[in-house]
Amino acid sequence: VVGDDFQSIYSWRGADFRNILNFEKDYKNTTIIKLEQNYRSTKSILDAAQSIIEKNVQRSDKKLWTEAGEGKPVSIVQVLNERAESEAIVRRVQNAVDARYRRYQDFAVLYRTNAQSRVIEEAMIRYGVPYRIVGGQRFYDRKEIKDIMAYLRLLYQPNDRVSFERIVNVPTRGIGTTSVQKFVNWQEANGMTLQDALDKVSECSELTAKARNNLNELGDILRSLRELVDETTLPGLLDSLLRRIDYMNFLDDKTPQGESRQENVKELVSVTQNYQDLGLDGFLEEMALISDADSVDYGNNAVTLMTLHAAKGLEFPVVFMTGLEETILPHSRARYD
């Protein structure tokens, strides 16, 4: 049996570091062979890792060593918040590239949860630093973010058919594709706006009673939220939207993926705090610009952004570990492990 109690990143797949720690108890007369030589990292990196893992209450007694030399010291940078952290990373990357000391592809930025990539991506875009995301989607390409942005666009542009067709069944309302097409055909044939058609959908005989009722409820939600656009703050509007459609509960499927989607939506809520003065129209315009810049393909010479899980087994000349704070890294769940 081969295992390492110092690594346990796949607990959601059933992995548990205690399986290795308890192996001698479960199987008597076991011979333990410690593999302590590290062939990849320098001594400074191993020392930093060892100083952290030594704080584990439950762990095996082993000391990693290497013949790779001392290496450059691990640098610890303390900043005010995640925005300052992202800008510090971008500046270091750009300075090294400008000095022709490194290429963009030499750098990797690691984070614990996918939601953390948003502020890093925006910093990269602001400063014109090429980047790519490995093992995941760019923040504004994630389904849950696209869903909420579609709702916001529909509040601002009541006749945005593309956004309407995206959100009409999100969360699930039991309105099928055929019903949506019948509704749109009826709306266009009668020369109505989408909101007027939703308000008068009871007159659409082509639809079932259930579909008419569900579309009418959606119309009520959109109308009431649209009335808030000029009366509340952008974060307040988004909060009202999430509560009216019960979106967070819709995402809560009791899986790590569901939790990640919820974290992404919470991150979007935090984004709106930075655009309160712009209003909904200004916010949507800014997000469109970011999304356009976000879609550029930079090829291989780009900074790599990825989660710690996705980075397993990979090597980079320069690595930034972000979000080293309680409840993020270590994650809030780690306190119960």
PLM regions: where:
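Conserved helicase NTPase motor core
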Residues: 1-22, 35-41, 241
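A residue-level signal for conserved active-site and pocket-lining positions in enzyme catalytic cores
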Residues: 2, 45, 89, 109, ...
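Active-site flanking residues adjacent to catalytic metal/cofactor-binding acidic residues
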Residues: 3-4, 111, 322
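Short alpha-helix plus adjacent loop in nuclease-associated cores
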Residues: 6-13, 40-41, 133-156, 168
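Switch/connector loops and helix/strand junctions flanking conserved nucleotide-binding motifs
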Residues: 8-11, 41-47, 54-55, 61-62, ...
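Flexible beta-alpha connector loops of hexameric P-loop NTPases
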Residues: 9-13, 33, 77, 334-337
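Helicase P-loop NTPase motor core
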Residues: 28-31, 36-130, 153-157, 212, ...
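Conserved helicase C-terminal RecA-like lobe
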Residues: 117-129, 142, 149-337
